[in-house]
Amino acid sequence: MNAARTGYRVFSANSTAACTELAKRITERLGAELGKSVVYQETNGETRVEIQESVRGQDIFIIQTIPRDVNTAVMELLIMAYALKTACARNIIGVIPYFPYSKQSKMRKRGSIVCKLLASMLAKAGLTHIITMDLHQKEIQGFFSFPVDNLRASPFLLQYIQEEIPNYRNAVIVAKSPDAAKRAQSYAERLRLGLAVIHGEAQCAEMDMDDGRHSPPMVKNATVHPGLELPLMMAKEKPPITVVGDVGGRIAIIVDDIIDDVESFVAAAEILKERGAYRIYVMATHGILSAEAPRLIEESSIDEVVVTNTVPHEVQKLQCPKIKTVDISLILSEAIRRIHNGESMAYLFRNITVDD
């Protein structure tokens, strides 16, 4: 890749090894140096950021991966963006491969849409643009008052399937719940493979969460016109577990955008084994793996878990050889180069559809 012109800097928003490593990969591809800054925690628990070079009039790209300590990472990003804003940076672009709180983008019970709040906070801190990957809900882009480029990791994962999975032509793409069916269908159509969907008790809990709001309370003494009686919504009842599609004697490839609830993938793998699948892969963009995840994966019927490096998971990878990583620094560095040079981003979205 050709080095971008002067007038931009790339900073790492935290000092963790994973974030620094991703930032170094990106700057190496760009032929640039990593910006000088210090991010650390005070003894009183506060986050402090110091920018150690001039950024006046430059385009600044902040790389921020989201480790298990999500709130600290968010504060690091906000404080660094604000520090760069007050230092007169021309544009401040956040490169946030996994956007935090993306699962809280819908109203649940008497909660709040936290993702919308975070979007407002980032704008207030000084960000003018965001580069991210595979938002949990594509509608999240509408929460922002500035441009958001939602890149896709699927080309990298599709390439991995074709190059690293032996006899992948004998595979079937599996959605572990009906809400993942569109993503799975996209993979199946591009690879010219069959599709299977797991439905029933193993389906995603997010689909079945009731609203939970029952207020205002019923007014006992009010007179209600007989013609105004409202029909009540029927309660949901999950059907018995079913696999729609044939996986017998096949390689099963479960695809999703996020792996955070490892137990649900383990349960799906057990079901597929019972239905005759002889090898099981799990593929996702974001591997948000808990401390227990390596043990659960190692003891399960899953043969391999493939995720990208949008989220740090090096410790879990050392504990479980089944976990494999696909590097996506290439597309992030190309996005940075194009944005800084004012080039079209269309090349990065070739053949991408709304279901990808």
From Swiss-Prot:
Acetylation in keyword set: yes
Gene Ontology annotations for the cellular component aspect, listed alphabetically: cytoplasm
Modification Phosphoserine, positions:
S177, S215
- Mark the residues carrying the PTM N-acetylmethionine: M1
By sequence similarity, the record places it as follows: Belongs to the ribose-phosphate pyrophosphokinase family.
Q: What does this protein do?
A: Seems to play a negative regulatory role in 5-phosphoribose 1-diphosphate synthesis.
Question: Its quaternary structure?
Answer: Binds to PRPS1 and PRPS2.
**In its UniProt entry, what is this protein called?**
Phosphoribosyl pyrophosphate synthase-associated protein 1
